[in-house]
């Protein structure tokens, strides 16, 4: 909006997932950053709460009765990802928009061929909107094309209608994509650099990542909202109900593609070699609501002996693989969402006596596998369904509480500190020249406070990053000779040749001989200096 393009940490960026930042722009009309952040919290709550509307629309479109509709809406209300409303995470709008995306595709499935073209065009344009929020949302687009190919395979006479629908879907998406590339994002590359080829070591780790992520995804979705629709798939014969033939496959494909994308773009790159890779179920969580609806429809049917056997085989296979392949979940509990209950117990197994942590983790996984088998028996025999529905709601509440606890521990800022940081922002806005912020800690709470409450452009370079780069070998950061930048996004600034002001965190050993302490009030743990030698910053290091 300032005419400087997209920027992250005051450097040009190709990151184009701008939908969530646009959604919180109204809060910037307020004067202080403290007031703006409070307003963003209320906006987040409103966006998250709006997820009940597409959940209700989905339930009604699937012909659910009032009791089941209330159950699906109730699960939506207490989904763990709802806790993201207290953060700056884009899940705030990803959840409601994902549910609307599924709704549009469902209406396209149920529509007559001519009307389906319009629904597909709308779904394609909406998918681009969702793509502006998260690139992983493309799993909806890919899954839809695969489902239409499956429908065509079973009804060759419908090839023209299927071709027209896919053309409308992909065409509307591409029009939005190319229009944005030619205007708003002109000259920019890709948002992520995680699309490159893997190394040999990463290729070897990829099969484990795929299997492990898939097994945990099934567990996160309570197993049977995945396994029951899988064993209850029907061929899409002419005149068949798309809610029972096409929708289950569409959701399962979306889930599978999402898991594969996570394994390829995150697990093999950030958890390489780890026996307990982190789980990013927050990218998949919106699929739980429509999968629950499909599961309820599947349970209405009488499972044949063959399908019961398939379900038993799938349950046993999942249980054996889960016990044998998986171990635990790595650090990063805020991404686990629906797996908070698993992680809560797993994190405390090191406190148990007699057996080691590895053995107790194996016991915990075995208990879960047995519990899933018992759950399957109860579902197939149609026993205790109301109790199980209540248990699902309780489990969601517990996972929500776990997410809230983690977010509060990670992001909470005392009101007094927030006011001080907001006052610092006002003071910095009056200063002329460049401001260099040197936090102590790479991507830690030091930088979070300043980056959140200071709206002015500042240059960020962590003290640890300076040490590792060798820029402080002589104790002097010479900005005319050395190009430095923050740990993320991992590039050096091209326009940082002077630092008129230095904002240093406690622990950063700046040499104050050429610095003059400013009058601006700073939050505890920070000091603002006027740099008398703007081209150099000296440090008291040997």
Positions of PLM-derived features:
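Membrane-proximal lumenal/periplasmic loop motifs of glycosylation machinery
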Residues: 3-25, 38
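Transmembrane-helix motifs of polytopic, lipid-linked glycan transferases
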Residues: 42-63, 96, 100-104
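Membrane-interface transmembrane helices that cradle and orient dolichyl/undecaprenyl
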Residues: 61-63, 101-120, 130, 154-157
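Membrane-embedded helix bundles of polyisoprenyl
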Residues: 68-81, 92-99, 119-127
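Membrane-lumen/periplasm interface segments of specific transmembrane helices
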Residues: 129-131, 142, 147-155, 160-236, ...
């Amino acid at each position: 909006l300032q005419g400087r393009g997209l920027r992250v940490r005051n450097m040009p960026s190709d990151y184009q997932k701008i939908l969530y930042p646009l959604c919180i722009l109204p809060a910037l009309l307020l004067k202080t950053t403290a007031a703006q952040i409070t307003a963003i919290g209320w906006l987040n709550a409103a966006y998250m709460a709006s997820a009940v509307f597409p959940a209700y629309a989905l339930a009604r479109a699937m012909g659910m009765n009032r009791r089941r509709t209330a159950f699906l809406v109730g699960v939506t209300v207490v989904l763990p990802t709802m806790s993201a409303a207290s953060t700056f995470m884009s899940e705030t709008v990803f959840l409601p928009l994902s549910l609307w995306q599924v709704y549009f595709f469902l209406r396209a499935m149920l529509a007559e061929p001519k009307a389906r073209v319009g629904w597909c065009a709308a779904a394609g344009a909406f998918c681009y909107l969702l793509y502006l929020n998260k690139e992983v949302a493309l799993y909806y687009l890919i899954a839809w094309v695969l489902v239409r190919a499956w429908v065509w395979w079973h009804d060759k006479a419908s090839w023209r209608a299927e071709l027209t629908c896919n053309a409308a879907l992909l065409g509307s998406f591409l029009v939005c994509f190319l229009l944005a590339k030619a205007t708003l994002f002109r000259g920019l590359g890709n948002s992520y650099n995680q699309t490159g080829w893997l190394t040999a070591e990463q290729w070897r780790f990829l099969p484990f990542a795929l299997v492990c992520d898939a097994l945990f995804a099934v567990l996160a979705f309570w197993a049977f909202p995945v396994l029951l629709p899988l064993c209850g798939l029907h061929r899409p014969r002419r005149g068949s109900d798309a809610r029972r033939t096409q929708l289950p496959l569409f959701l399962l494909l979306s889930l599978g593609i999402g898991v594969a994308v996570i394994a390829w773009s995150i697990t093999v790159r950030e958890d390489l070699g780890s026996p307990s890779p982190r789980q990013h179920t927050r990218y998949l969580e919106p699929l739980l609501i429509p999968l629950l609806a499909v599961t309820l429809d599947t349970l209405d049917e009488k499972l044949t002996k063959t399908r019961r056997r398939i379900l038993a085989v799938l349950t046993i296979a999942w249980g054996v693989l889960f016990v044998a392949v998986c171990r635990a979940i790595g650090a990063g509990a805020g991404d686990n969402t629906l797996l908070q209950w698993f992680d809560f117990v797993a994190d405390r197994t090191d406190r148990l006596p007699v057996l080691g942590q590895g053995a107790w983790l194996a016991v915990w996984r075995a208990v879960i596998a047995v519990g899933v088998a018992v759950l399957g028996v109860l579902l197939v025999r149609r026993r205790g369904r109301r109790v199980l529905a209540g248990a699902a709601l309780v489990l969601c509440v517990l996972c929500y509480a776990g997410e809230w606890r983690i977010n509060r521990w990670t992001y909470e800022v005392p009101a007094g500190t927030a006011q001080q940081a907001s006052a610092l922002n006002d003071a910095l806005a009056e200063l002329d020249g460049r401001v260099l912020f040197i936090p102590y800690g790479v991507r830690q709470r030091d930088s979070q406070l300043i980056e959140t409450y200071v709206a002015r452009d500042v240059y960020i370079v962590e003290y640890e990053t300076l040490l590792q780069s060798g820029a402080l070998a002589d104790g002097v950061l010479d900005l005319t000779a050395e190009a430095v930048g923050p740990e993320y996004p991992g590039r050096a600034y091209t326009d940082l040749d002077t630092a008129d002001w230095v904002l240093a965190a406690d622990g950063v050993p700046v040499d104050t001989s050429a610095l003059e302490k400013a009058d601006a009030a700073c939050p505890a743990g920070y000091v603002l200096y006027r740099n008398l030698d703007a081209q150099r910053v000296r440090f008291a290091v040997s």
